[in-house]
C-alpha cells in the first residue's frame, strides 16, 4: 500500500515470472529520471503476491500523470538487455484516489482508512468475480487453531501438480499465490498448504463433493499437525543420543525430544519432539553438525514421508555390486553383442545399469538414474536386481569336456564350421561349450561322439608309418608314365602313395615293413635314371620356362617312345631319361626340334596397332603350346624393339615368315640425313621439285628437327625412305655454298631486325637462301669449320644425348660426359672394357661385339693368337666392324683386389693412358670411353671414374706435343655411371685455369727468370713438376711415397707424426722399420725405407731430421737440405710419380716454420731444374688442418712465389751489377720486375681499390684537384682527408703533403704536385716511406692526367727515381712499388722502359755539378732541347665485330649476285659521323667510360684520331645518330663547364667570398665563389653552398652559413681591386653593353681608321663603333695582368684585326671570342681563333662576309699574344715551352714566329673586341 501522500502506479515488464536481481534499484533510477521516464521522486516496492509486478509510489500527482502520458517505457539494462515496461493505474479506485486524502490524514487516520478499506472490500467480495476470498469470508473461530494443510491421498499418476492447483483454486476461490502444493509420487499423495486462514473443514467437504473429485477419486483429509522432523545429510557416525542432545539445545531452537530413530544407510534420522510448537523454532534456524550443514524437514507419520517444500529430498542411491559369470559363458556373450544388449534392456526395467568387463567374467550392476523417482524400491533394489539376473543366467549353460591335443587338432575343423549359437573353445586339453541351454545340450552330444571316434582313429594310426621321398616333378613323371608307381600300388594295396609337386616329395603311408620296402624300390629306380645338362640359347631357355615341361616333353618324346623329360633348375636345363639311351635320343630330339628367330622393329608403334594384334593373336592361339612370340619393347627409346619367335622349328619358321612379311609392309622408319652446312637444309626446303617427289613416295619430310637441327628427317616405308635419301644427296652435291664476311659495326643487328624480309627478298630475286652464321661456341663447331666425317657424326649425336657435363681440359680439347649406348655412338674410336683373352661374352664387350658383327671377334682372336693374352693395364686396337666408328681399343683393366688398391689404381690409369696414346697414334680426333673395370671386374665405381678422369688430365698435362684428340667422351649407362663421371670431372678440374694457363704455356719460376703457374695452392716448375700445398692428415695421403719423421731409436710411438703413421699403417710398419734399421748406424740425417702397409702410399721414407740450432743454423739447414734432396732422388729412382712431405722437424725439434717452408720449396725447385725427371710428377706438402702456423708459413711462401717475389735473398742495395731483374707478366695487364730489393709493378686498374701502406695522389699546387684520378682518390678517402688537405696546403711544404688514409685501404696518402718534376716527387715519396718504415707504395702515373705530361717521360722518371733511391742508400723498409694506370695505352710506355732495362746494371751516377756542366756545354754548342712528344689522347676500347653470312644457291652466279646485293645493302645502312671540336681533347675519365658504354650498347664503333683530335663514329644509321647526340651533348657540357670556369676565374679576380672556421679564414673554391657572387648581385635572400662536403644555407643579409644540424659559419665578401674602366668610355647608365658610334673627328676614330686604311684603302668606312663591355674588359685585364706577371718585360698585347659576318656580331659583342668561336673559319695553325696583323687579310669575303646590303664587318681587337711560336693544324692548345716542364706553355701560335702575320688564340678572355668597323666596297 502506498505511503502517506503517494500516488501509485503498477509496473509490469518483459522479464517474465522470475525478475532479475536488483531490478528494483534499476526501476528506482529509471522512474526518478525526468529525462528517461518523465517521473521524479518515487519509491519502488514489489507487488504483494505477484513477484513479477512492482508498485511505484510517486509524491506529486502530476508526476504520476506525466509518466502515464508518456507512451513507451523501456528499461535499458546493459548486462541483461532491454525490457519493455507497461505502466497501469491500480484497479482499486479507492487506492488510486487515496492521494486526495493523504496530504491531510495523520498516521492514525491512515490506519483507520486502511481498515475501512478492508471492511469495504469484505462487503464487496461476494460481488467481485475476481476476488480471492469469495468463499472464505466467514471463517469460524474454531478453525483458527486447526492445521492449514490438506492431504490428498490416492493421487493418480495422471493428476499433475497444475491440475491439482486449478482444482484447489476452483474449490477454495483463492489464487495460487495463497497456497502451496507439494506432490509426492512415491506415496501417491499431495499436500496443500494454505497461506491465508481458511475454513479447512468446509474446504475438505467441498473437495469431496466437487464433481471433479468424483472423476479423480481423490481422498482429501486434514493433515495433522506433526511433532516429528526428518534430519538429512547427517555426518557418518552420528547416533540417536547425539541427535537428542543437539535438538534439545535451545540454541538450535529445540525442545524436549521424545524419540530419535537413525537411518545410517540414508544418512538421515527422525526426531520426535514432545511439543509440536518446537517445530516452528527448529525449522526457522539453519543447522550444521561438525561444520556439515543439516537439512531439517517436517515429517508426517501418517504420510510416511517428510514434506520438502521447494527443496528436493536428498536421496542416496544404493552402492553397485558385482556378479561373476563362467568364463566360457562370458566369452560367449562377448562374441554376441546383441545378447548383451538384450540383457542390458531387461535389467533396465529394475533400474539397473550393467558394465561388462573386457578382460574377465565380472559383471558390475549399478543403480540407474531412474531409481531416484522410486524411493520405495531403493531398499530392496540389490535383492531384486540379483534375482532378475539369476533368472537370466538360468537360460544359458556351459559344458566341459576333457580332450587331448591330437584329438582336438583333428576335430577342430569340423567344430569351427558350426553355427555361432554356441561358443566352442579349447584350452589346456579342455573343451568348453557355452550358449543357450538348449543349444548347448544339442552340441554336447555331437562333440561327445566326435571325440570318441577320433580317439579311436588316432589309436589305429599310431600303429602305421608315413615316409617321404624327395623326387623332382620330372622324375615323378617318368615313374608314373613308366608304370612303376602303378605296379607298386598293385603289390601293396593298403599303402597310400601320394605326390606333392610343390614340395617335390612322394609320400608313403602304410605298415612299417611295407613302407620301407617300397621306399627302397623307388630310390633305386630314381638313381638308375640318366641326367644331363644341355646348353640351349637364352631365347629357347626362356621359351621352355613359359610352357608346361611335362606337356612339351610328352609332345616331343612320347611319339618316338622316348621315356624322358626336361627340367629347369635356376638357369640350367637338365634332360632326364629313364635310361642313357632314352637320354641320348631325347637330347638329339630337343636340339633339332627347338629353334628361335628374331626381327628388329624400328617402328614401335606398329607393335601396338590393331593390325599387329590381329596378326599375332591368331598365331599365338594356334601355336600356344609349340611356340611363343615375345616383343622386347621395354628398353630405352633409342633401342629398336625386337620380336623374338621361339619354339618348335616348324612353327617358328611359319610364324617368323608371316610376321616378317607383315612388318616389312607396315613398319614405318625414320632416317636422319646429316646436311652440312645446315644452310643447305633451308635451300632444300624451298626446292619444290624435291618436295613433290618425296610427297609422291608417301614419305614425310621434317627439316631441321629439334634434336638434330643440321639434318633432314625422312619418315615412311623403309624402301621409299631410302629412295628419297638418295634423291636428297644428289641435290645436296649439286648446290653452291659461299661465305661472306664483314667487320662493319651493327651488320648482324640490322640484318636480324629484318631477317625475315631479307631472306624472302633474296629467295625471290636470286633463288638463294642466306644464313647469319652464329658464333662458333654457340654452334659447338670447330673454328676452321671443317671436321672429319666421324667427328661430325659424333658432334651431331651430342645433341641427341643426355649431356651431363662439358669442360675444356686443354687448349682445343673438350671433355664430355654422356649417358649413351656405346654400340651406337658415332666417334672415331670406342674403348671396349675387355678381358685378357679378348672374348666378348658379357657386358659391354658382348654388346659391342654383337653390334659390330662376327669380324670383330675374329680379329680379336687373331690378336691373341699372334701376341698372346693381353695383360691388365694394356690395350690393343682393332677395326670396328659394323660399329659407327673407325676403331675399337680393347682396354684390359685390372680386376679389383681390396688388398692391392694402389696396384689396381696404377694399372687402371695405365690402361687409360695407353688407350689415349693408341687413339692419337691412329690420328683419331674423338674417343668414347666407358667406366673400364667398373662392371664385372668389381672396381668401385667412384674410385674407378675418379682415376680414369685423373689419368686423362695427366695425359694432357704432361704430353707437350700437339694432340690429335679434340673430344673425349666419357660414356656411362645406366645414368648413375654418367653422374659419377660428372662428379669426378668437377672434382678433378675444379681448380682448372683457362686455356692460356695450361702446361704448354706455363712460365718458369721467378728465380729462373720466369713465373710459375698458380692453381690455388699450387706451383708448377718450368719443367712441369707440380708442387701442391695440401691440408690433410698423413693418414689420408694418396701419394706413391710419403716421408715420416722418427727418432734415432726407431720407435714409432714417439712423436705425434710417427704415431699417426703407426695408427693407420698398423704394427707391421714398426716391424718393417726395425728390420730395415738392423745393422745401420741410425743418426741425424738417416733415411730408412719401408712399405706403406695399410697406408694408401706404397712407400714410407723414415727420416731422422736435425734439431734447430740457433747458434749453428747452417748445420741444421745443410742436413735438412740433404734429407729433402735424398727423398726426392729415391722417389725418382723407384719410378714413383708422387711424394708427400709433412712439416718434419718443425715440432719438438723446433725448426722455424717459415725457414722450413722456404727451404723445402727452394730445394724441390732446384731438384726439378737440375735433374731430368722421368717419373716424378707431383710433390705435396702435407700439413695437418689444425697446424695453423705451418699452413700460414707455407701459404706465405706460395703467395710470394706466385706474386713474383720468390727470391731467397734480396740483392744488396750497393750491388750495381744486374740491379734490374727479369721482366715478367704474371697476369693480363700487369708487368713486374725487381729493381734491387724493390719489386716494381705496373698494372691497369682502379687505385682506390688497392691495398698498400701508402697511396700517392697526383694533384695541383693548391692540393685541391677535383678531377680525374685525384677526384676519385679524394672522394674515396672521405671528407676528413679533404679537410686535412686544405689545412696542410696553407702551411709550408716541400712540394708534397701527407694526410691520413681515410676510407682507403692504406695508412697514409701522400699528395704530390703532378706538374712538378716527377722524379723528384717520387724520390720524396720513397724517402718519406722509408722513414716511416712503410713497405708498400701504390701511385698513379703522376702528371699524365691534368698536368698533361708525356707518359714516356713520366715512366722513365719514376723508374729513375727508384733506381737512384736503391743506389744511394741501403733500403730496409720499402719492398714494393706499384704504379696503377687508368688509361690502358700508358701501360705500353712503362713496359717499353722496363723492357729496355731488363737485366741491365744501373748506369754510373753523375754528380749534379757534372750534369749541370754537361747541359751547359750542350747548350753552348747549340744542341736543341729534346722536343716534348705530344700528349697522348684518350684511347677507347677497340670494338671489332665480325659478321659472317652463308649463301646457298643452285649455282655460283646466283650466289655471287646475292652477295653483291648484300654488300650494297650494308653500305646503304652504314653511316659515319666525325666531330673535331677542340673540347674532344678535354674528354676525361667520365667521358671515356661513357663512350665505351655507348659503344657497347649501340651497334657502332668509335675511334679517336689522336693527330686531328677528332672522334669518329661508324655503324648503323640510327645508332650513329644516337651516338652523335650523346657525344655532342658531352661536348656541350664540357664547353659550358669551361665557360663557367672562365667566368669563375674572372669573378675571383675582383671578389673573394670567405668563411671563418675555428677562427681561421677559409676561402671558397672559385665555383662556389661565383655562385655566391651571382646570388649577391641578384639580391637573393639566401643560397645553398657546400662546406666540408655538407650543404649550408648562406643568408646573404646576415652573412651566416647554417647547416641542417644547426652548425654555423660566418661568411664575408672581400672585394679585390678591379680593373679600371677606360676614362674615355661614355657613361653606360648601368647597361652591361654599349656600342658608341665614334665621330670622324675623334682621335680614336682616326687611330682605328688609319690602321685599317694601311692595307684596305680601297674600302669605304661607314662607321666605327667603340664596344664598351665592362665584364669582358675586366676579364681581359685580369688575364693581361697574369700574363704580364708571368712573362716579365715581354710586350704581351697587340692590336689585330678579325673579320666576321653580321650574324656573329651580337655574340662577339657580349661574350667576346670564347672557345665556341674557335676554328670557325680556319684550322691551319691550330684549332683556335685567328687574328690578322693586316686588315686586308680579314677583309676578304671568306672572313668578313658581306650582308644583304653589302656591308662588311671587322673588329679591331686587343690580343694578348705574349710568347708565341709556330703553330700547326693538330694543335688544340699551345705547345710546351720547356720539355722538362710540360705545364709551361706558349701563349699563342703564329704562322711565322720571325715575321708573324696571323696569331691563333686558344683561351677565353685573351682578347677584347675594342672597335667594330662597318665598311663596304
Curated annotation (Swiss-Prot):
Top-level class of the enzyme under EC nomenclature: transferase
Binding site for a glycoprotein 2: 1034-1035, 1045, 1057-1060, 1145-1149, 1187-1190
Ranges annotated as biased composition (Acidic residues): 774-795
Cited InterPro entries: Macro_dom, Macro_dom-like, Mono-ARTD/PARP, Nucleotide-bd_a/b_plait_sf, PARP14_KH_1, PARP14_KH_2, PARP14_KH_3, PARP14_KH_4
Biological process terms in GO annotation: innate immune response; negative regulation of gene expression; negative regulation of type II interferon-mediated signaling pathway; positive regulation of interleukin-4-mediated signaling pathway
Effect of residue 1384 to S: In strain: Czech II
Modified-residue entries (Phosphoserine), positions: 33, 1419
List of residues binding a glycoprotein 3: 1246-1247, 1258, 1269, 1343-1347, 1382
EC number per UniProt: 2.4.2.-
Cysteine-cysteine disulfides: none
WWE domain: residues covered: 1539-1617
Assembly and binders: Interacts with STAT6. Interacts with PARP10. Interacts with PARP9 in IFNG-stimulated macrophages; the interaction prevents PARP14-mediated STAT1 and STAT6 ADP-riboslylation.
Function description: ADP-ribosyltransferase that mediates mono-ADP-ribosylation of glutamate residues on target proteins. In contrast to PARP1 and PARP2, it is not able to mediate poly-ADP-ribosylation. Catalyzes mono-ADP-ribosylating STAT1 at 'Glu-657' and 'Glu-705' and thus decreasing STAT1 phosphorylation, negatively regulates pro-inflammatory cytokines production in macrophages in response to IFNG stimulation.
Protein name (database record): Protein mono-ADP-ribosyltransferase PARP14
Lineage summary: Eukaryota, Metazoa, Chordata, Craniata, Vertebrata
Gene it is expressed from: Parp14
Amino acid at each position: 500500500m502506498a505511503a502517506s501522500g503517494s500516488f501509485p502506479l503498477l509496473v509490469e515488464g518483459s522479464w517474465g515470472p522470475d525478475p532479475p536481481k536488483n531490478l528494483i534499484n534499476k526501476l528506482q533510477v529509471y522512474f526518478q529520471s525526468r529525462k528517461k521516464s518523465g517521473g521524479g521522486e518515487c519509491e519502488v516496492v514489489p507487488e504483494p503476491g505477484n513477484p513479477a509486478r512492482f508498485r511505484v509510489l510517486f509524491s506529486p500527482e502530476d508526476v504520476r500523470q506525466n509518466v502515464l502520458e508518456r507512451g513507451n517505457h523501456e528499461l535499458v539494462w546493459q548486462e541483461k538487455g532491454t525490457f519493455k515496461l507497461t505502466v497501469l493505474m491500480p484497479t482499486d479506485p479507492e487506492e488510486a484516489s487515496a492521494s486526495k486524502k493523504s496530504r491531510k490524514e495523520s498516521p492514525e487516520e491512515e490506519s483507520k482508512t486502511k481498515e475501512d478499506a478492508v471492511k469495504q472490500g469484505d462487503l464487496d467480495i461476494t460481488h467481485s468475480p475476481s476476488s480471492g476470498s469469495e468463499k472464505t469470508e466467514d471463517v469460524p473461530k474454531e478453525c483458527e487453531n486447526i492445521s492449514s494443510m490438506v492431504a490428498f491421498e490416492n493421487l493418480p499418476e495422471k493428476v499433475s501438480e497444475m491440475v491439482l492447483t486449478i482444482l484447489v483454486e476452483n474449490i477454495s476461490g483463492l489464487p495460487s499465490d495463497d497456497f502451496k502444493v507439494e506432490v509426492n509420487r512415491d506415496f501417491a499423495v499431495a499436500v496443500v498448504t494454505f497461506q491465508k486462514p481458511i475454513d479447512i473443514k468446509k474446504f475438505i467437504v467441498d473437495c469431496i463433493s466437487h464433481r471433479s473429485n468424483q472423476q479423480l477419486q481423490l481422498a482429501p483429509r486434514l493433515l495433522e499437525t506433526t511433532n516429528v522432523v526428518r534430519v538429512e545429510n547427517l555426518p557418518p557416525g552420528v547416533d540417536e543420543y547425539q541427535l537428542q542432545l543437539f535438538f534439545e539445545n535451545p540454541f538450535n531452537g529445540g525442545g524436549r525430544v521424545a524419540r530419535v530413530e537413525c537411518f545410517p544407510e540414508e544418512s538421515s534420522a527422525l526426531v520426535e519432539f514432545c511439543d509440536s510448537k518446537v517445530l516452528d523454532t527448529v525449522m526457522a534456524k539453519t543447522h550444521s553438525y561438525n561444520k556439515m550443514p543439516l537439512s531439517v524437514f517436517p515429517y508426517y507419520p501418517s504420510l510416511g514421508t517428510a514434506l520438502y517444500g521447494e527443496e528436493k529430498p536428498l536421496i542416496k542411491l544404493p552402492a553397485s555390486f558385482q556378479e561373476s559369470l563362467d568364463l566360457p559363458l562370458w566369452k560367449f556373450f562377448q562374441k554376441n553383442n546383441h545378447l548383451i544388449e538384450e540383457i542390458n534392456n531387461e535389467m533396465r526395467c529394475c533400474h539397473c545399469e550393467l558394465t561388462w568387463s573386457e578382460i574377465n567374467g565380472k559383471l558390475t550392476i549399478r543403480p540407474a538414474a531412474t531409481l531416484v523417482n522410486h524411493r520405495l524400491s531403493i531398499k530392496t533394489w540389490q535383492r531384486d536386481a540379483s534375482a532378475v539376473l539369476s533368472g537370466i543366467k538360468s537360460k544359458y549353460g556351459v559344458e566341459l569336456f576333457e580332450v587331448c591335443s591330437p584329438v582336438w587338432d583333428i576335430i577342430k575343423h569340423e567344430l569351427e564350421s558350426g553355427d555361432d549359437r554356441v561358443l566352442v573353445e579349447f584350452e589346456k586339453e579342455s573343451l568348453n561349450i557355452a550358449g543357450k541351454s538348449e543349444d548347448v545340450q544339442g552340441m554336447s552330444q555331437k562333440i561327445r561322439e566326435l571325440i570318441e571316434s577320433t580317439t579311436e582313429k588316432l589309436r589305429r594310426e599310431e600303429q602305421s608309418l608315413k615316409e617321404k621321398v624327395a623326387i623332382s616333378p620330372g622324375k615323378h613323371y617318368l615313374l608314373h608314365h613308366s608304370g612303376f608307381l602303378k605296379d607298386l600300388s598293385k603289390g601293396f594295396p593298403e599303402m597310400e602313395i601320394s605326390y606333392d609337386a610343390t614340395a617335390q616329395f612322394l609320400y608313403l603311408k602304410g605298415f612299417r615293413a611295407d613302407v620301407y620296402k617300397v621306399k627302397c624300390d623307388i630310390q633305386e629306380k630314381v638313381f638308375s635314371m640318366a641326367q644331363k645338362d644341355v646348353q640351349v640359347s637364352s631365347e629357347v631357355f626362356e621359351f621352355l620356362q613359359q610352357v608346361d615341361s611335362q606337356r612339351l616333353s610328352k609332345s616331343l618324346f612320347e611319339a618316338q617312345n622316348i621315356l624322358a623329360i626336361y627340367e629347369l633348375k635356376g638357369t640350367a636345363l637338365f634332360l632326364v631319361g629313364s635310361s642313357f639311351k632314352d637320354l641320348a635320343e631325347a637330347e638329339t630330339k630337343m636340339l633339332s626340334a627347338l629353334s628361335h628367330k628374331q626381327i628388329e622393329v624400328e617402328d614401335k608403334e606398329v607393335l601396338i596397332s590393331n593390325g599387329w594384334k590381329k596378326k599375332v593373336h591368331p598365331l599365338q592361339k594356334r601355336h600356344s603350346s609349340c611356340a611363343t612370340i615375345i616383343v622386347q619393347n621395354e628398353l630405352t627409346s633409342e633401342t629398336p624393339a625386337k620380336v623374338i619367335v621361339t619354339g618348335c622349328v616348324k612353327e617358328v619358321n611359319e610364324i617368323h615368315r608371316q610376321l616378317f612379311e607383315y612388318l616389312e609392309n607396315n613398319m614405318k622408319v625414320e632416317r636422319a640425313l646429316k646436311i652440312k652446312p645446315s644452310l643447305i637444309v633451308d635451300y632444300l626446303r624451298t626446292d619444290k621439285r624435291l618436295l613433290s617427289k618425296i610427297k609422291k613416295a608417301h614419305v614425310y619430310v621434317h627439316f631441321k628437327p629439334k634434336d638434330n637441327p643440321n639434318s633432314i628427317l625422312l619418315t615412311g616405308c623403309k624402301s621409299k625412305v631410302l629412295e628419297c635419301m638418295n634423291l636428297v644427296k644428289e641435290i645436296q652435291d649439286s648446290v653452291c655454298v659461299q661465305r661472306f664476311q664483314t667487320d662493319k659495326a651493327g651488320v648482324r643487328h640490322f640484318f636480324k631486325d629484318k631477317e625475315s624480309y631479307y631472306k624472302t627478298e633474296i629467295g625471290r630475286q636470286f633463288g638463294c637462301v642466306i644464313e647469319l652464321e652464329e658464333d662458333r661456341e654457340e654452334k659447338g663447331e670447330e673454328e676452321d669449320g671443317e671436321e672429319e666425317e666421324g667427328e661430325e657424326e659424333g658432334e651431331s649425336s651430342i645433341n641427341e644425348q643426355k649431356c651431363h657435363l662439358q669442360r675444356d681440359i686443354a687448349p682445343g680439347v673438350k671433355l664430355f660426359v654422356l649417358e649413351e649406348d656405346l654400340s651406337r655412338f658415332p666417334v672415331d674410336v670406342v674403348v671396349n672394357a675387355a678381358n685378357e683373352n679378348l672374348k666378348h661374352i658379357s657386358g659391354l664387350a658382348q654388346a659391342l661385339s654383337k653390334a659390330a658383327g662376327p669380324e670383330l671377334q675374329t680379329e680379336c682372336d687373331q690378336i691373341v693368337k699372334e701376341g698372346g693374352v693381353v695383360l691388365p693395364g694394356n690395350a690393343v686396337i682393332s677395326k670396328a666392324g659394323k660399329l659407327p666408328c673407325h676403331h675399337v681399343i680393347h682396354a684390359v683393366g685390372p680386376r679389383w683386389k681390396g688388398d692391392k688398391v694402389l696396384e689396381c689404381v696404377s694399372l687402371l690409369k695405365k690402361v687409360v693412358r695407353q688407350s689415349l696414346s693408341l687413339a692419337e697414334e691412329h690420328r683419331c680426333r674423338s674417343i668414347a670411353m666407358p667406366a673400364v673395370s667398373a662392371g664385372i671386374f668389381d672396381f668401385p665405381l667412384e674410385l674407378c671414374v675418379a682415376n680414369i678422369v685423373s689419368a686423362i688430365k695427366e695425359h694432357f698435362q704432361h704430353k707437350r706435343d700437339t694432340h690429335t684428340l679434340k673430344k673425349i667422351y666419357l660414356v656411362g649407362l645406366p645414368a648413375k655411371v654418367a653422374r659419377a663421371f660428372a662428379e669426378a670431372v668437377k672434382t678433378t678440374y675444379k681448380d682448372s685455369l683457362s686455356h692460356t694457363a695450361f702446361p704448354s704455356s706455363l712460365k718458369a719460376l721467378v728465380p729462373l727468370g720466369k713465373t710459375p703457374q698458380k692453381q690455388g695452392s699450387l706451383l708448377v716448375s718450368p719443367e712441369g713438376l707440380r708442387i701442391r700445398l695440401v691440408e690433410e692428415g698423413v693418414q689420408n695421403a694418396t701419394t706413391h711415397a710419403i716421408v715420416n719423421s722418427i727418432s734415432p731409436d726407431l720407435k714409432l710411438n714417439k712423436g705425434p707424426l710417427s704415431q699417426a703413421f703407426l695408427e693407420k699403417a698398423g704394427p707391421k710398419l714398426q716391424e718393417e722399420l726395425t728390420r730395415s734399421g738392423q745393422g745401420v748406424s741410425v743418426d741425424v740425417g738417416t733415411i730408412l725405407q719401408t712399405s706403406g702397409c695399410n697406408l694408401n702410399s706404397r712407400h714410407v721414407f723414415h727420416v731422422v731430421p736435425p734439431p734447430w740450432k740457433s747458434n749453428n743454423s747452417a748445420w741444421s739447414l745443410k742436413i735438412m737440405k740433404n734429407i729433402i734432396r735424398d727423398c726426392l732422388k729415391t722417389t725418382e729412382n723407384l719410378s714413383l710419380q708422387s711424394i708427400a712431405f709433412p712439416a718434419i722437424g718443425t715440432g719438438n725439434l723446433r725448426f722455424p716454420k717459415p725457414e722450413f717452408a722456404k727451404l723445402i720449396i727452394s730445394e724441390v725447385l732446384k731438384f726439378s731444374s737440375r735433374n731430368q725427371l722421368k717419373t716424378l710428377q707431383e710433390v705435396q706438402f702435407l700439413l695437418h688442418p689444425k697446424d695453423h702456423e705451418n699452413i700460414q708459413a707455407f701459404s706465405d711462401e706460395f703467395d710470394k712465389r706466385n706474386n713474383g717475389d720468390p727470391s731467397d735473398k734480396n740483392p744488396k742495395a750497393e750491388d750495381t751489377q744486374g740491379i734490374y731483374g727479369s721482366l715478367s707478366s704474371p697476369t693480363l695487364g700487369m708487368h713486374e720486375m725487381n729493381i734491387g730489393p724493390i719489386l716494381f709493378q705496373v698494372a691497369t686498374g682502379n687505385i682506390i681499390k688497392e691495398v698498400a701502406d701508402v697511396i700517392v695522389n697526383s694533384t695541383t699546387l693548391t692540393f685541391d684537384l677535383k678531377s680525374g684520378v685525384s677526384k676519385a682518390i679524394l672522394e674515396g678517402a672521405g671528407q676528413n682527408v679533404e679537410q686535412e688537405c686544405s689545412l696542410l696546403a696553407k702551411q709550408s711544404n716541400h712540394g708534397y703533403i701527407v694526410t691520413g688514409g681515410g676510407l682507403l685501404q692504406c695508412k697514409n696518402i701522400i699528395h704530390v704536385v703532378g706538374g712538378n718534376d716527377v722524379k723528384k716527387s717520387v724520390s720524396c715519396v720513397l724517402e718519406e716511406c722509408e722513414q716511416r718504415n712503410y713497405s708498400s707504395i701504390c701511385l698513379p702515373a703522376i702528371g699524365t692526367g691534368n698536368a698533361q705530361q708525356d707518359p714516356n717521360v713520366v715512366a722513365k722518371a719514376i723508374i729513375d727515381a727508384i733506381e737512384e733511391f736503391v743506389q744511394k742508400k741501403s733500403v730496409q723498409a720499402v719492398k714494393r712499388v706499384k704504379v696503377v694506370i687508368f688509361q690502358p695505352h700508358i701501360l705500353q710506355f712503362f713496359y717499353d722502359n722496363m723492357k729496355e732495362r731488363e737485366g741491365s746494371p744501373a748506369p754510373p751516377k753523375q754528380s749534379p755539378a757534372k750534369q749541370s756542366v754537361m747541359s751547359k756545354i750542350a747548350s753552348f754548342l747549340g744542341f736543341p732541347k729534346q722536343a716534348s712528344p705530344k700528349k697522348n689522347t684518350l684511347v677507347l676500347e677497340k670494338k671489332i665485330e665480325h659478321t659472317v653470312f652463308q649463301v646457298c644457291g643452285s649455282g655460283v652466279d646466283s650466289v655471287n649476285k646475292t652477295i653483291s646485293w648484300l654488300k650494297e645493302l650494308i653500305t646503304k645502312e652504314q653511316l659515319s659521323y666525325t666531330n673535331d671540336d677542340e673540347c674532344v681533347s678535354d674528354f676525361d675519365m667520365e667521358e671515356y667510360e661513357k663512350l665505351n658504354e655507348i659503344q657497347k650498347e649501340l651497334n657502332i664503333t668509335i675511334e679517336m684520331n689522336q693527330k686531328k683530335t677528332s672522334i669518329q663514329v661508324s655503324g648503323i644509321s640510327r645508332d650513329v645518330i644516337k651516338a652523335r647526340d650523346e657525344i655532342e651533348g658531352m661536348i656541350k657540357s664540357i664547353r659550358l663547364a669551361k665557360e663557367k670556369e672562365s667566368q669563375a676565374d674572372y669573378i675571383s679576380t675582383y671578389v673573394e667570398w670567405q668563411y671563418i672556421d675555428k677562427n681561421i679564414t677559409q676561402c671558397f673554391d672559385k665555383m662556389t665563389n661565383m655562385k655566391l657572387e651571382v646570388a649577391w648581385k641578384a639580391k637573393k635572400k639566401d643560397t645553398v653552398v657546400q662546406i666540408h662536403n655538407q650543404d649550408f644555407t648562406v643568408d646573404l643579409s646576415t652573412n651566416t652559413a647554417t647547416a641542417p644540424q644547426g652548425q654555423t659559419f660566418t661568411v664575408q665578401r672581400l672585394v679585390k681591386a678591379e680593373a679600371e674602366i677606360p676614362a674615355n668610355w661614355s657613361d653606360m647608365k648601368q647597361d652591361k653593353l654599349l656600342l658608341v658610334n665614334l665621330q670622324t673627328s675623334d682621335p680614336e676614330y682616326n687611330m682605328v681608321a688609319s690602321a685599317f686604311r694601311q692595307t684596305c684603302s680601297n674600302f669605304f668606312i661607314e662607321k666605327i663603333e667603340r664596344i664598351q663591355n665592362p665584364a669582358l674588359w675586366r676579364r681581359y685585364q685580369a688575364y693581361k695582368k697574369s700574363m704580364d706577371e708571368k712573362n716579365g718585360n715581354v710586350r704581351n698585347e697587340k692590336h689585330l684585326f678579325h673579320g666576321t659576318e653580321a650574324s656573329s656580331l651580337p655574340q662577339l659583342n657580349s661574350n667576346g671570342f670564347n672557345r665556341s668561336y674557335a676554328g670557325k673559319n680556319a684550322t691551319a695553325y691550330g684549332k683556335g681563333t685567328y687574328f690578322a696583323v693586316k686588315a686586308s687579310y680579314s677583309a676578304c669575303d671568306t672572313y668578313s662576309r658581306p650582308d644583304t646590303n653589302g656591308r662588311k664587318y671587322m673588329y679591331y681587337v686587343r690580343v694578348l699574344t705574349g710568347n708565341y711560336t709556330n703553330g700547326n693544324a693538330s694543335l688544340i692548345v699551345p705547345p710546351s715551352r720547356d720539355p722538362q716542364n710540360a705545364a709551361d706553355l706558349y701563349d699563342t701560335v703564329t704562322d711565322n714566329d720571325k715575321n708573324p702575320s696571323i696569331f691563333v688564340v686558344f683561351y677565353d678572355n685573351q682578347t677584347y673586341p675594342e672597335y667594330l668597323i662597318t665598311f663596304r666596297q
